[in-house]
């Protein structure tokens, strides 16, 4: 098929690695430390971590806030925060210590998004049109340009400024989603390594979230491997699934061995809350999603939509099918939520950013310049509002 991209080598200059790293660290650190919790979920997350850090084995196995059990997510996110509180207790206060892993996880997610787009951007089917006398970019340089775009699109999303700095389990889920997408892409050229990364991501997201979310991700990604020839590998079943299973059952087995009665009750509640959270949308929930999801995922979603139409002849190619295999199940869960919440919205951002970056080389230069100016204006206005809001709280 004839390439839809017309680019020269001079148009694909990549950003320095140190600059991307600095941008990610500054974004992750800004507003993370030296503050009180922003809202109830942030405060509750810290409270559970503090209870674990000061408590016993029972508190670590069954997340609770001073005796009130939280059964909507697994314990992994709380474990990381509590471990950080304990490790840094002599030097850093508990509130700031609990957020150290938040910053590290955020930077990890950024790295997964960058490398995912980089690997996809080097593939033959996405390369620019080859001119008769040369001048097109090398696959490596083109891949780096697309990877830079994916990372910047991710950091530009409005919703990330709110959810990306909280002490909640959603950030662990966020990095696991980014890892899962990376594992699927890595599996194309390194099947065993990619399958192991995918299995690790599925296992960790099980420990950090809910059974329904895990089931949706499993169905979406396994169905995609049946459609996309490049991702078919026996190692997904022979290596990936066993790793996922071992990690997923580790917490329930330990809990059942240590506190059988409490574990049975807690695990039943964990499953019940997971199922009841996706019982179908009342009208108010659908209206909430229609109003807030486009703003939360801006500017990734319009670029992803443009990418869908631009690559209409290659919709079974990995750079289209792999992100959509995660976006699709997550979007279904967003629609089926029983209560108004934007918790799941952040999980859409890693695959959306990867998919959206493939719209950039298909846009005309004028459109790209307009996007740059709009992004600058939006960030200025949004940053001013966030700063004023924080000043008013203080």
Whereabouts are the PLM-identified features?
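Start-transfer (signal-anchor) and selected internal transmembrane alpha helices
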Residues: 1-29, 236-244
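Extracytosolic helix-loop segments that constitute the early lumenal/periplasmic catalytic or substrate-binding loops
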Residues: 27, 45-69, 76, 83-86
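Transmembrane-lumen/periplasm boundary regions of multi-pass, lipid-linked membrane glycan transferases
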Residues: 45-55, 200-342, 371-394
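Loop-to-helix entry region of an early transmembrane alpha helix in multi-pass inner-membrane enzymes
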Residues: 79, 88-111, 116, 143-148, ...
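Transmembrane-helix motifs of polytopic, lipid-linked glycan transferases
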Residues: 100-138, 155-156, 179
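Membrane-interface transmembrane helices that cradle and orient dolichyl/undecaprenyl
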Residues: 141, 145, 162, 180-197, ...
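Specific aromatic-rich, kink-prone transmembrane helix
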Residues: 159, 172-189, 351-355
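Short acidic/glycine- and proline-prone juxtamembrane loop motifs at membrane-interface regions
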Residues: 159-172, 211-213
């Amino acid at each position: 098929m004839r390439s839809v991209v017309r680019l020269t080598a001079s148009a694909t200059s990549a950003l320095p690695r140190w600059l991307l790293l600095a941008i990610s660290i500054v974004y992750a650190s800004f507003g993370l430390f030296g503050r009180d919790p922003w809202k109830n979920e942030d405060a509750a997350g810290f409270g559970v971590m503090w209870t674990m850090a000061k408590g016993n084995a029972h508190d670590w196995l069954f997340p609770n806030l001073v005796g009130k059990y939280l059964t909507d997510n697994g314990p992994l996110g709380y474990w990381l925060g509590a471990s950080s509180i304990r490790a840094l207790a002599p030097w850093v206060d508990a509130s700031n210590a609990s957020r150290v892993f938040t910053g590290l996880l955020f930077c990890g997610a950024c790295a997964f998004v960058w490398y995912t787009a980089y690997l996809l951007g080097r593939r033959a089917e996405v390369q620019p049109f080859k001119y008769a006398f040369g001048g097109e970019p090398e696959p490596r340089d083109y891949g780096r340009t697309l990877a830079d775009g994916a990372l910047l699109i991710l950091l530009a999303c409005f919703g990330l400024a709110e959810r990306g700095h909280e002490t909640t389990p959603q950030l662990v889920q966020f990095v696991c989603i980014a890892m899962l997408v990376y594992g699927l892409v890595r599996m194309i050229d390194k099947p065993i390594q990619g399958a192991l990364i995918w299995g690790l991501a599925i296992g960790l997201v099980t420990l950090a979230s809910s059974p329904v979310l895990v089931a949706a991700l499993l169905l979406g990604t396994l169905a995609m491997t049946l459609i996309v020839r490049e991702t078919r590998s026996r190692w997904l079943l022979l290596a990936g699934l066993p790793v996922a299973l071992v990690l997923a059952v580790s917490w329930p087995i330990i809990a059942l061995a240590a506190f059988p009665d409490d574990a049975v009750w807690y695990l039943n509640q964990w499953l019940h809350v997971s199922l009841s959270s996706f019982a179908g949308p009342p009208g108010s929930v659908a209206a909430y999603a229609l109003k807030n999801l486009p703003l939360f995922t801006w500017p990734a979603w319009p670029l992803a939509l443009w990418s869908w139409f631009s690559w209409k002849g290659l919709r079974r190619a990995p750079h289209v099918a792999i992100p959509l295999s995660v976006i699709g199940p997550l979007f279904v869960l967003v629609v089926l939520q029983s209560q108004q919440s934007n918790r799941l919205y952040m999980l859409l951002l890693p695959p959306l950013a990867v998919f959206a970056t493939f719209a950039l080389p298909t846009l005309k230069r004028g459109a790209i310049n307009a996007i740059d100016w709009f992004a600058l204006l939006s960030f200025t206005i949004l940053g001013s509002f966030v700063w004023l809001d924080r000043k008013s709280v203080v």
